[in-house]
């Protein structure tokens, strides 16, 4: 299935100061019909691999451990819209398996690379390359199992549907201190050479960078990451594995180059969000 180009997108990061919206009030952007999200109480595989990406400058997003010291997230989570520059790594903290003030493992971010080698320091992220790989200061592999990635495009979709199901999980604005899981998730169509997809997963602000997982039996693979909401349809927008899987494979073998952000003005203390 092919859909028209998905743009403009409401980028789905959220400031850490925002509170849960009272029930019965305004609808939550990105929640499509009934709210299918459920609170995930477990921190076992694969849920413990997903974590909250805190930012001492304000916004938080979601990320997933893909290697002992590597986290996959959305690039726009690292863009400071006030200063029109990339956020210094020392302002970022990854908390794997975060749950109401506790977590399985934590690390500061030492550096990060912008997806696809994009090097535009002051232009902000391109939606077709809206992913980034964080290099953590600490190895978290002893506490959390990294999740692998797989490509996703229109030629693979039907086969994936036959052999598995799609699940999205992330930290939403209205439930910022618990991982929510959406088991009723599906890919609806593609655009931009299959690098972007519309999806039917309930995901809202704060879920940026959260994985859309393909579950096949007991195995989970990241096939896309949530990056925003289509203004026209209200559907979720994801960056597919076609955009990042091959690049990540190169990263495992050797540094593929691109823009590595290392500059840091200060090291900050761990932000303790209120439960």
Model-derived features: positions:
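Catalytic nucleophile loop of clan PA
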Residues: 64, 202-226
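Protease-domain processing segments flanking chymotrypsin-fold serine proteases, especially trypsin-like
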Residues: 19-66, 180, 243-275
